[in-house]
Amino acid sequence: MNSPVLTDDGRARARDLGLVPGRLPTGPANAISDVPGVRVGHATVIAGADIRTGVTAIVHDDLLSGAAALPAGLSVFNGFGKMVGSTQLAQLGTLETPVLLTATLSVFRVADALLSCLHERHWGNPQEGHEPGTLNPVVAETNDGYLSDIWARPITTEHVRMALDAAADGPVGEGCVGAGTGTSALGFKAGIGTASRIVGWATGPVTLGALVQANFGGELTVLGTPVPAAEALAAAGITDEAEQGSGGSSGGGAPRLSGGSCVIVLATDAAVGSGRLERVASRAFAGMARTGSDFSGRSGDYALAFSTAAGRATAGPDERVPDSDLDLLFKAAIEATEEAVLNSLFMATTTRGFRDHIRHAVPLDYVRARLRASRG
């Protein structure tokens, strides 16, 4: 059997390559986990020749313990997707569970498994109290069907439990991990990416972090410079259409560039309510656009933002935050999302999967050469 990972050396985050989107400073790990109390865990599922998928969990202490709901907002750029829990979240402006990411046809099993895991943690022992009358699991997805057999729906309750148990602060795994194991973007192998920004408010510094599951079409653009997939792969010696795998090309050896989806999760410790969090979430798509997304009609593009400032922000409008401070949070959302997408691509490795399809990693040397040439 061929190894699912064909190259695993020389990968680097955008900043490691000297590529810095925007001007705002980052948190210590430059990750969504820089927001206090936010942790990320992955369960990567690779089996046989056809399964390249997984689960990613974004956890906050209150959400995992069942202690409280957090204010949240949802923005949908294009609704070609299956996000469990989205309508209640949008209506009530609250997040009740960890946010889980997975593959399209596994989303329903993951939602059920999340409920089971939370129930056994908190309400399985009658002496610890009664379970709530209802709970709104939030699970989002992208379609990793090019590299993984989505109809197999291989995700189990144990995988969800593993992702929740693995959730940790500090550096976050990126690229071909968890829900990013089988995803592709902009003609290349992609996956999970994350970044953070710190902004100075009148009340003190606040942190915003972004995590993306990148799986969308378009033409990769790095700091304003186009990096066409066909040219980049040809420069790396990958010119045979067959090497892309059947169904993965649009002709002439160029990888298929249109379609796909992106899920963006933003977390912040800023004390803002759901109405303004929805506005923050909507700015994430500007960051996604900067990386070259084509936002096609068959792309499910969702951005969810939540605040960890429980007790200091409500689900309603928060008039205490001046517009000037909110503008800084908008900027942070744009910059962090842009960098998270780049990290999802730059940290991903060439992968072989379903039906012997191959998706190649971005040749980083070519990216650097392209940017040097564009800058004269």
What are these regions (language model features)?
Residues M1-G376:
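Alpha/propeptide regions of enzymes that mature by internal proteolysis
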